Amino acid sequence: MKSLQALFGGTFDPVHYGHLKPVETLANLIGLTRVTIIPNNVPPHRPQPEANSVQRKHMLELAIADKPLFTLDERELKRNAPSYTAQTLKEWRQEQWPDVPLAFIIGQDSLLTFPTWYEYETILDNAHLIVCRRPGYPLEMAQPQYQQWLEDHLTHNPEDLHLQPAGKIYLAETPWFNISATIIRERLQNGESCEDLLPEPVLTYINQQGLYR
């Protein structure tokens, strides 16, 4: 049986414990040995990042330097066009054997807007979705047809993610940290401490670069 590969995308502006710790817990829960972080260059669904792509890449490298679970993939940073998950997953699938299990990790907030993503209906053709639950968000989709789509693909057994190459949605009971990049940027702008929110080497780099001031 080929091992499950997991991808974790985002802007990471900056990377923080709210990104890393839930995924580390997830890896222990469902048996992941490697998670590939894919930072995007031009996010299509949100405002453009304050730190440039080189700075965000370097912050990620600092954050995962002592974490063998994580590796970094730069393909989306090299695109000047918007970074679409559907496109990236198609590329990954073409690079792998067809029967290699592949999963894409998202937060529960992203699941609720998932039907607005570019070519969202193709994503489950190439990967599973692993959803990290977050308090305060509803468990149901806004429209009945999307709720039916969720139920058609939902599994409560993480072993299914290892046995099939794609097509399942798994809601993972991961811890939630009340941390966001927005909170960190606001605290830095106000001169407040962020030592408990992100790895020390990342904070040192932010201060050296004068970011988020």
UniProtKB/Swiss-Prot annotation:
Tell me, which GO biological process terms does this entry list?
NAD biosynthetic process
- Name the enzyme's class: transferase
Keyword Zinc: yes or no?
no
Keywords noted in UniProt? ATP-binding, NAD, Nucleotide-binding, Nucleotidyltransferase, Pyridine nucleotide biosynthesis, Transferase
Molecular function (GO) terms listed?
A: ATP binding; nicotinate-nucleotide adenylyltransferase activity
Q: Which reaction does it catalyse?
A: nicotinate beta-D-ribonucleotide + ATP + H(+) = deamido-NAD(+) + diphosphate
Annotated metabolic or biological route of this protein: Cofactor biosynthesis; NAD(+) biosynthesis; deamido-NAD(+) from nicotinate D-ribonucleotide: step 1/1
Q: What is its EC number?
A: 2.7.7.18
Domain of life, per lineage: Bacteria
Q: Report the PANTHER family cross-referenced here.
A: NICOTINATE-NUCLEOTIDE ADENYLYLTRANSFERASE-RELATED (PTHR39321), PHOSPHOPANTETHEINE ADENYLYLTRANSFERASE (PTHR39321:SF3)
What does the protein in this record do? Catalyzes the reversible adenylation of nicotinate mononucleotide (NaMN) to nicotinic acid adenine dinucleotide (NaAD).
What family does the Swiss-Prot or TrEMBL record give for this protein? Belongs to the NadD family.
Any idea what this protein is called?
Answer: Probable nicotinate-nucleotide adenylyltransferase
